[in-house]
């Protein structure tokens, strides 16, 4: 009887222990909402047989969810469109370091994380677009010049709560300092054509509708408009031209930000997750990104889509990308202080 009880107890304990057997899948927490991502995952599944499960939400919600889940989080990978959120997750201890020279060798060194917690997938620039009818290219020069009185009532941009604007402001804090950036923001707010609203596409549509003459937008949105199936969006895209700021001699270059991927600290399917990181780093996957989302490849040998190539090459701001995270709170403080809604 005692022997029976002993065996029963062993079996009961074993049944209650967590199942360590790795499943043939990966779980992604992703902020990205682009169709190209689904194409990438489908191609990866066909190639490897590994099922890709994706949970989508905004970055702050996903970060909080991983924090709450702790060691029991099912997430293997975190993907976001902003370095600031990648830095935040790494700083909170949610990620583990990723080290693979075979991946890093395919990436522009300027785009790499100095702390080793995330890998860039694509990048884009936050550019100025201008009306082909009401603005001459030679009127534009730098981000700093957007504070000039000549743009009063002519500048369109989305709200300060948007991560893209927060990243741009963070880069200005890094390059100019808080005092100069605050002065800049005050003057820029005074130049708004309307209170900030809508997304980047909406700023371009507003230019086409004559509600403003210039706008601050992410570069790839112009590609998305020009390749749209909607006539209104195509016409909006055609109504503007792209300008990369701060390109003159001795100037720092245009602000950039990345979409990136991070391996979670307690990834339950680590081997599979690493396989996906490596796949998204391949030339094939990078070409899929640029030809469908109109972003720039992190691989210098992968050319942009033809639409993007037409804008010409540009000089990138060489600032440490993690400063877009470390300066984020100061950027938000400046937004609030200067009335950028």
Can you name each region flagged by the protein language model?
Residues 306-341:
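Extracellular/periplasmic bilobal clamshell ligand-binding domains
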Residues 171, 176-245:
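Ligand-binding pocket segment of bilobal, Venus flytrap-like solute-binding proteins
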Residues 17-87, 341:
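Early extracytoplasmic/lumenal segment of secretory-pathway proteins
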Residues 1-26:
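Short, low-complexity disordered leader/linker segments with a strong preference
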Residues 29-32, 114-115, 130-132, 138, ...:
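Short beta-strand->loop
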Residues 73-78, 96-128, 144, 154-157:
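A structural signal for short loop-to-beta-strand junctions that line the ligand-binding cleft
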Residues 127-134, 256-269, 288-291:
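A bilobed periplasmic-binding-protein/Venus flytrap-type ligand-binding module shared by bacterial periplasmic
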Residues 153-160, 279-303:
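Periplasmic-binding protein-like
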